């Protein structure tokens, strides 16, 4: 795959990056270099290699999935400038 100047301009527009017309050939060249590096990955033999989710073996500790209220209502509401009946109180906005 090769990137020409019009494609480079389109990518720049989609990325909301202002690129001067004089800089488009260099940008297209950089895109082509990047794509060349990516195409090298197709040459790697990955037959027999297991998919990985991480480069280090990790096992996540599991805990029981228990529904709880968190028992934090008083602490959370202590930060509120105004709380009533266990809820945040805010000024009325709509009449």
Swiss-Prot record:
UniProt EC number: 6.3.5.-
For molecular function, the Gene Ontology terms on record are: asparaginyl-tRNA synthase (glutamine-hydrolyzing) activity; ATP binding; glutaminyl-tRNA synthase (glutamine-hydrolyzing) activity
State the reactions this protein catalyses: L-glutamyl-tRNA(Gln) + L-glutamine + ATP + H2O = L-glutaminyl-tRNA(Gln) + L-glutamate + ADP + phosphate + H(+); L-aspartyl-tRNA(Asn) + L-glutamine + ATP + H2O = L-asparaginyl-tRNA(Asn) + L-glutamate + ADP + phosphate + 2 H(+)
Q: Which keywords annotate this record?
A: ATP-binding, Ligase, Nucleotide-binding, Protein biosynthesis
Superkingdom: Bacteria
Broad EC category: ligase
Q: What does this protein do?
A: Allows the formation of correctly charged Asn-tRNA(Asn) or Gln-tRNA(Gln) through the transamidation of misacylated Asp-tRNA(Asn) or Glu-tRNA(Gln) in organisms which lack either or both of asparaginyl-tRNA or glutaminyl-tRNA synthetases. The reaction takes place in the presence of glutamine and ATP through an activated phospho-Asp-tRNA(Asn) or phospho-Glu-tRNA(Gln).
Q: Which HAMAP family match?
A: GatC
Protein name, UniProt field: Aspartyl/glutamyl-tRNA(Asn/Gln) amidotransferase subunit C
Which organism is the protein's source?
Answer: Roseobacter denitrificans (strain ATCC 33942 / OCh 114)
| Gene it is expressed from | gatC
